[in-house]
Amino acid sequence: AYNQRKDRWSISYLRKAEKERIARGEIEVTGKDENGALILQFSKTVGRMKNPVTVWNQRSHNAGAGGSNVLRALIPGRAFAFPKSVYAVLDTIRFAVANKPHALIIDFFAGSGTTLHAVNLLNAEDGGHRRCIMVTNNEVSAEETKSLSAQGFQPGDDEWEKLGIARYVTWPRTVCAIEGHDVNGHPLKGNYLSGDPEHPRAMAEGFK
């Protein structure tokens, strides 16, 4: 390669990492120069990879704005302590599967279902077909346990199970996010904070 500033030629060899990026389509071979050296450029259709920084300071990553507020819109009146921001999870998984449109993501601690919600958002942004498997039990909160026990209910009773995290939070949140309405059947209001800021995705649009 010729360095015009230093008026110097040098020989550069493709390392294994660069060859792998060419194979993945991240770097394109656009031709050869007069000396037979390959001409490379970063793909315009595949996002350029970069290492994540240690600290993220974005309002959308706040557990209140991107976590509690989103969950409250989907399942109003149903409490869940400290839900993660769907946008923080979205940006986290983007680093791992941005160039894997058919990836399968497994969340062994599904909680309120934020990971699946984030996967749907990423698919909506780039047209991917990623899938997500969520694993959770159906335990009730400590407060609900005391209340239900005092009423004579126990695990396995319908009154107990319907207040468990899977049936009361995770599953309803997932259905509502996909269908674009809250648990009461009302269309969701507002837009998602991710994606194209000029053409934001309406929450009521869901993920069909």
Region locations from a protein language model:
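Short mixed-charge
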Residues: 178-205
